[in-house]
Design a protein with these regions (language model features):
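Short acidic-hydrophobic, aromatic-tinged amphipathic segments that line or gate anion-handling sites
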Residues: 102-105
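Amphipathic alpha-helical interaction surfaces in cytosolic regulatory modules
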Residues: 26-100
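A Rossmann-like FAD-binding core segment of flavoenzymes
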Residues: 3
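STAS-typified acidic loop motif
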Residues: 7-34
Length: 105
């Protein structure tokens, strides 16, 4: 399975929403990194990552999320994970990232 990435900017909340579906692993993590980096540089707003349709994430995918978080925090912005499935939430909990990255839903 592959990763699908849809993005949209929300003026009302000054946030950029990234919708992920499929699997985020080593084979496609670079695609997400490029998308995040490009949009962080352009808009530099808060980022909300909708993971409601993400089936799987590996350590490479986690690394991309952490890298984006660091770039955002350096500009006083934030990243929020939305609606992650239980198996994806478990990875964030095991790594302790649920204490660092805001998770909703």
């Amino acid at each position: 399975m592959s990763l699908n990435i849809n993005t949209k900017y929300r003026d009302d909340s000054n946030s950029w929403v990234v919708e992920l579906s499929g699997e985020l692993d080593v084979s496609c993590a670079d695609d997400l990194k490029k998308e995040l980096d490009s949009n962080i540089e352009k808009k530099f707003s808060d980022v909300k990552v909708d993971m409601s349709n993400l089936q799987y994430i590996d350590s490479t995918g986690i690394g991309v999320i952490v890298g984006a978080m660091k770039k955002l925090k350096s500009g006083d912005k934030d990243i929020t994970i939305l609606e992650a499935k239980d198996n994806v939430k478990k990875i964030f909990k095991i790594t302790g990232l649920d204490q660092i990255i805001r998770m909703e839903g």
